[in-house]
């Protein structure tokens, strides 16, 4: 079998490292800093900006435990996948992306993730898949409880909040209010 030739370095330069592509690139670094501030506002400790932490998911004394750590990984991986998609688009089209475009795409993906998780609150496999209840001999437990959802996405009401229905209202109950915007991870005014 033939071996593919090694990738050629760009004219007059070196091959780009993953560390540069995802942590140091001027188009990505502002989004990293945005996510660090968002995570801090959500009550987390800002992790070190190192390749093992951001690219491999390594944890240390800074890391939260349990559900909060899972939330951190969801945020981190969503940022990395969004940056990767924009880099692939740049490679295909030659169109360079800007930091604000990366942040906007990240916010959109996170909003979709939060909304999808909200759809799972109180729902069971039967509710979401169209499966027959008889396929589940025991009562299927919900994917998410309200408490689990609030613990992940409603900490300090930065990303989302759940509002009870107004008094006397009829309908399905609690309402999801998405609060996540590009300003959610922006530096404080005057900083």
Locate each region found by the language model:
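Family-specific functional microsites
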Residues: 1-191
């Amino acid at each position: 079998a033939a071996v593919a030739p090694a990738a050629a370095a760009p004219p007059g330069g070196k091959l780009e490292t993953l560390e540069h592509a995802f942590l140091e690139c001027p188009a990505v670094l502002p989004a990293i800093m945005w996510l660090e501030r968002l995570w801090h506002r959500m009550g987390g400790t800002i992790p070190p900006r190192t390749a093992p932490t951001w690219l491999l998911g390594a944890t240390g004394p800074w890391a939260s435990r349990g559900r909060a750590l899972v939330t951190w990984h969801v945020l981190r991986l969503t940022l990395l996948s969004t940056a990767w998609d924009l880099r692939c688009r740049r490679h295909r089209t030659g169109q360079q992306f800007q930091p604000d475009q990366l942040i906007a795409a990240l916010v959109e993906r996170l909003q979709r993730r939060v909304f999808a998780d909200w759809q799972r609150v109180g729902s069971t496999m039967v509710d979401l898949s169209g499966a027959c209840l008889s396929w589940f001999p025991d009562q299927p437990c919900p994917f998410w409880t309200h408490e689990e959802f609030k613990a992940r996405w409603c900490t300090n009401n930065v990303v989302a909040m759940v509002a009870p229905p107004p008094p006397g209202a009829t309908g399905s109950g609690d309402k999801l209010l998405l609060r996540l915007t590009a300003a959610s991870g922006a530096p404080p005014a005057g900083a």
